[in-house]
């Protein structure tokens, strides 16, 4: 235990929390250019072809970003916006693509949870 005098001279240091999304550099989203768009398979109990883009960000980082929703229009050199949020069954994928912004189209035919996929409200 430190004495009060010791604490007055040198206060206790706060523990630093390590960021889960270091490439965002404390920003809510970042813009980047797709360098590669590909599919990959998830970890053990799951089975699928998950859509992933390798993205070179404006701050120089290169990260993998998950493309959510059914179907997408992304290809190499597409400019996209990424946000934080990992994909539990894809190791190394710690970012999500923001659908419906920049070059990434929203999911068409989406009726529920539309705001997460950049889908407009259906007519009628």
UniProtKB/Swiss-Prot annotation:
Name of encoding gene: rpsL
Protein family per UniProt: Belongs to the universal ribosomal protein uS12 family.
Task of the protein: With S4 and S5 plays an important role in translational accuracy. Interacts with and stabilizes bases of the 16S rRNA that are involved in tRNA selection in the A site and with the mRNA backbone. Located at the interface of the 30S and 50S subunits, it traverses the body of the 30S subunit contacting proteins on the other side and probably holding the rRNA structure together. The combined cluster of proteins S8, S12 and S17 appears to hold together the shoulder and platform of the 30S subunit.
One MF annotation (Gene Ontology) recorded for this entry: rRNA binding
Keyword Zinc: no
Keywords: Methylation, Ribonucleoprotein, Ribosomal protein, RNA-binding, rRNA-binding, tRNA-binding
Biological process, per Gene Ontology: translation
Subunit: Part of the 30S ribosomal subunit. Contacts proteins S8 and S17. May interact with IF1 in the 30S initiation complex.
Species in which this protein is naturally found: Hydrogenovibrio crunogenus (strain DSM 25203 / XCL-2) (Thiomicrospira crunogena)
Name of this chain's protein: Small ribosomal subunit protein uS12
Protein origin, superkingdom: Bacteria
PANTHER family (alphabetical): 30S RIBOSOMAL PROTEIN S12 FAMILY MEMBER
3-methylthioaspartic acid sites (modified residues): 89
NCBIfam families: rpsL_bact (TIGR00981)
Pfam families: Ribosom_S12_S23 (PF00164)
CDD domains: Ribosomal_S12
Gene Ontology CC annotations of this record: small ribosomal subunit
Residue pairs linked by disulfide bridges in the UniProt entry: none
InterPro entries cross-referenced by the UniProt entry: NA-bd_OB-fold (IPR012340), Ribosomal_uS12 (IPR006032), Ribosomal_uS12_bac (IPR005679)
